[in-house]
């Protein structure tokens, strides 16, 4: 099957070549607002492959890979591996594409970026999907992520890689079988030049976590206020160690336009390919021109 997206690049303000997948949609679908999909800390554009294909049936979908991930350049200065810099990179892409109103799907770190972008320029987002993240994240989940990111593990075969993921993240996906772990491995890893299978990101993205104060969970309640009244779908894994039920309740109070869907027996983060989640996302977009 031919690819339904184009590999494109833009240049960051500090000269990095950054990659994004452009799904043009039917006939360019100019009449409908585009969708911007932003991935999590260690992820890349492949995370949204199935969702982007589905959404591109009716509208354009843009899936950037943040610096240090996938086909995007690695940064020479690891201090630039921060949500503020990622937001600046994405804002430059949006400006170059002439996009001033859009829908956002943000997973984990991508959701944090969504709130920062909303706070900096309110009123641009027609609808938002937040995947297992909120203005306040649990310290337990942050500690778990800090413990595995940047470890530089490698594997001799895809099956070994899948089993490695199952060992590390089995608590978040207790019902996954080997095929599903293989699928996750192929979304998050690549074959390196020496033939070993490695994670598809710069291990240096972990360095900012090691600096004093940087590992503290962010508090973005003020930024979240910029999304008050914006139609929102909050997806939460029932087993999530990053997004608590209490935070979900507070988010609903602050944004009455938010609907929540909880994915049973899944932790951080749902794939967004779950049938109920996919249906909810499509329903949200049905209300957006």
What are these regions (language model features)?
Residues 1-35, 57-59, 99-100, 276, ...:
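Alpha/beta-hydrolase fold catalytic core
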Residues 13, 21-27, 49-56, 62-105:
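Active-site loop/oxyanion-hole signature of alpha/beta-hydrolase fold enzymes
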Residues 36-40, 236:
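The conserved beta1-alpha1 loop
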Residues 40-43, 108:
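Active-site glycine-rich loops that stabilize anionic/oxyanionic intermediates
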Residues 100-139:
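Conserved hydrolase catalytic core segment
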Residues 156-210:
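Conserved alpha/beta-hydrolase catalytic His-Asp/Glu region
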Residues 190-253:
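Conserved serine/cysteine hydrolase catalytic core
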Residues 266-275:
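Catalytic histidine-centered segment of alpha/beta-hydrolase-like enzymes
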